[in-house]
Amino acid sequence: MRIAVMAGTPMDTKLGVNLLKENGFTQTISVPISNNPVEQTTFQSLEEEEREQYIRSVIDGMKNEIDAVFVYCNSLSSVVNFDKLEEEYKLPMITPMQMYRTLGVEHDYLAVMAANSHGLTGVENNLYIANPNLKVFGVTMLELVKAIETGKPQEEIIKQFDFQSLFHYFESTEIEAVVLGCTHFPYVKTELQQLSNIPIIDVGVYM
């Protein structure tokens, strides 16, 4: 199966390719939509028609060479209706947003760490589809995305953003789990797990 890995930047595209390879899918095409996090956030701020038109042009250029599209970017999949495009192109399109529609059923209170407001809104909306009574504590961290893009060691990033204090706050509330609402964030998942007993949810493993 030939899979196009579409993501916001070259970094999360690479992370998506690595995730697929770990699960036995080796025939991939890398399709980063932007060169860096700021450029991607700017793209997400365009009018809906402009965003969709650009994504269509990308899909049109490769649709005869692929069997599926793996959208490994929360915020991108929250601002483009890939469900509609999947039906139109008759091409499987897997996105993180689809995973959140079942995740919300299992919890009453979640913390969501997202890259920007676009991603956070998309995650929240899809969680609420499954559970309208769910409580969500949302945090947006574009600066964390930028730090990960530099390839800085995980432990340095954890200290830079003082995640110890953030997770201490989470522990003082009734938050049941922390959702990594950005596909960059699994980069620091191992270090985050050492800070607390609160479960870390990475929807990428379910995609």
What are these regions (language model features)?
Residues M1-M207:
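Non-catalytic structural scaffold of enzyme domains
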